[in-house]
């Protein structure tokens, strides 16, 4: 049986590995900018100007990277 592809994890992992600057839009419209330093099933660790923020995924609306991210869809 073929493994299902987890696009979210691939996307976040590429952002983390490539140190891609990203803008996070929260559900309340607030924007956070920085680098993804880590993530798990429920949270994303964002670093901005040397300070870390742990954001719950259920509060995030959109990830907008500064450049396109290459991920494997097959």
Curated annotation (Swiss-Prot):
InterPro entries: Hfq (IPR005001), LSM_dom_sf (IPR010920), Sm (IPR047575). SUPFAM superfamilies: Sm-like ribonucleoproteins. GO terms for cellular component: cytosol. Residues 9-69 form the Sm domain. It comes from the Bacteria. It holds the Pfam family Hfq. Keywords: RNA-binding, Stress response. GO terms for biological process: regulation of DNA-templated transcription; regulation of RNA stability; regulation of translation, ncRNA-mediated. GO terms for molecular function: RNA binding. Belongs to the Hfq family. Homohexamer. PANTHER family: RNA-BINDING PROTEIN HFQ (PTHR34772:SF1). RNA chaperone that binds small regulatory RNA (sRNAs) and mRNAs to facilitate mRNA translational regulation in response to envelope stress, environmental stress and changes in metabolite concentrations. Also binds with high specificity to tRNAs. This is RNA-binding protein Hfq. It comes from Bacillus cytotoxicus (strain DSM 22905 / CIP 110041 / 391-98 / NVH 391-98).
């Amino acid at each position: 049986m073929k493994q299902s592809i987890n696009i979210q994890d691939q996307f976040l992992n590429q952002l983390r590995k490539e140190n891609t600057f990203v803008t996070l839009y929260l559900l309340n419209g607030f924007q956070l900018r920085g680098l993804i330093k880590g993530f798990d099933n429920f949270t994303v660790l964002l670093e901005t100007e040397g300070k870390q923020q742990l954001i719950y995924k259920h509060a995030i609306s959109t990830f907008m990277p500064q450049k396109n991210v290459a991920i494997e869809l097959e």
